[in-house]
Amino acid sequence: MEGVNSSSSISDLDELARLLDRPRVNIERKRSFDERSFSEMGIFDNVNSPGGWETPVSSARNSFEPHPMVAEAWDALRRSLVYFRGQPVGTIAAYDHATEEVLNYDQVFVRDFVPSALAFLMNGEPDIVKNFLLKTIQIQGREKRIDRFKLGEGAMPASFKVIHDPIKETDSINADFGESAIGRVAPVDSGFWWIILLRAYTKSTGDTSLAETSECQKGMRLILSLCLSEGFDTFPTLLCADGCSMIDRRMGVYGYPIEIQALFFMALRSAMSMLKHDAEGKEFMERIVKRLHALSFHMRSYFWLDFQQLNDIYRYKTEEYSHTAVNKFNVIPDSIPEWVFDFMPLRGGYFIGNVSPARMDFRWFALGNCVAILASLATPEQSASIMDLIEERWEELVGEMPVKICHPAIESHEWRIVTGCDPKNTRWSYHNGGSWPVLLWLLTAACIKTGRPQIARRAIDLAEARLLKDGWPEYYDGKSGRFIGKQARKFQTWSIAGYLVAKMLLEDPSHLGMISLEEDKQTKPVIKRSYSWT
């Protein structure tokens, strides 16, 4: 793994210096960014990370000048607000009048609302976020059944819909815990996003009273009980079904997907900072600390892939027995796909999609890797390597519209087997290598934390060239993300909010504190690279 080159990234330092000279927005709410130390913010540990010279050059336009898209985006975001008894409680998934078939796009999705919530928090409007957090925790308390099976008490809804009765002049809420979803899979990520958003609200407002309420404390404990329960697993990672997260259709991510593991890690660390130090809280804290230590070691050791590790796997022996085995998961080297040898640069690395017995999914997944950086699941060196990979493989991972949800696409016979001939997930479309503008905020946050703001600026420039003109599509198709998705909804709320959050993060990097965690030295294991000798 490459070390940090202190002589590189001078352009990054100049860029950050310009950021710090700018005045704060809503300065009365918190100290200005330039009054806070880099170490306190915990986002500039890797300012001198390698590869700064190769960062794609942004356009000469100053992105901090008011862009016409910003006002349009705020108008569109506010049009998507959903009200319950006169109070805003979320935003609908899409506000597309041109589409007659609404499906469930008129509902408030937990994961979809996160970028909307962050936009409102960064704009000094926390009330809607508070309302959402309280409403969803009330929904969590309902009895949840799919057919004749009762779901776990801590399960959070995938979405909910506010039903207005004009005759009785009453509002009611219908929640979906997976019983109406395609494939009938419960959302594993909803509970994690809820905890992460609760911490973001607390960090942004300085108000700890919401997290300290009995409702929120109980809600966190119920979510944690589900994912910390003992079972037959020999790994600290969470075993999941296909379709349990943002990729909510069959895409071969069953097992231990990187997205869920990264969110799990971030939610555990977020909960640690908010649980009360009473008897119940301390019990969960002890369990969290043990799990974090095991999870960080497992992910950093077995999910991480760089050129050297790929070469090691290529040379693995198989059928090794006992605790001395180097090839612990008995991965057959012949199962390594051909594309990864060309894709892996000498400089760079990433967390692969999945690791389980005799199986490694070498695909790149953007959300999981960006969250790994924000949660400090990735070490500073690994975080820098992920950004190096994005720079080295810009055309493949960003292309003409940020950001590819995964790479590469699966096709032909593999597509038929893995997706079940899913007509929506054809190659380079939707979840199968499609480009999703919502991921722009996660990429931007990861860029700022690793001291690479130029990468984010270049990606935002690409988005600004088309997003508004195209009507804020849900996703784009094609190998480079050139075409509006064949079934993409227009005025997709999280595409709008993702853009706003990315812009506000670049304008005021101190916002990153609400969605970023510094590295916990206690969970940092000593990682020794294993070699398989022939």
From Swiss-Prot:
GO biological process: one example: carbohydrate metabolic process
The protein's name: Probable alkaline/neutral invertase D
Reaction equation(s) it catalyzes: Hydrolysis of terminal non-reducing beta-D-fructofuranoside residues in beta-D-fructofuranosides
SUPFAM superfamilies to which the protein is assigned, alphabetical: Six-hairpin glycosidases (SSF48208)
The keyword Cell division is assigned to this record: no
Described function: Invertase that cleaves sucrose into glucose and fructose.
Family membership: Belongs to the glycosyl hydrolase 100 family.
Annotated gene: INVD
Entry-annotated residues carrying Phosphoserine: 7, 37, 532
Record's keyword terms, sorted: Carbohydrate metabolism, Glycosidase, Hydrolase, Phosphoprotein
InterPro entries: 6-hairpin_glycosidase_sf, 6hp_glycosidase-like_sf, Glyco_hydro_100
Broad enzyme group: hydrolase
Chain positions found as Phosphothreonine: 55
Record's signal peptide: none
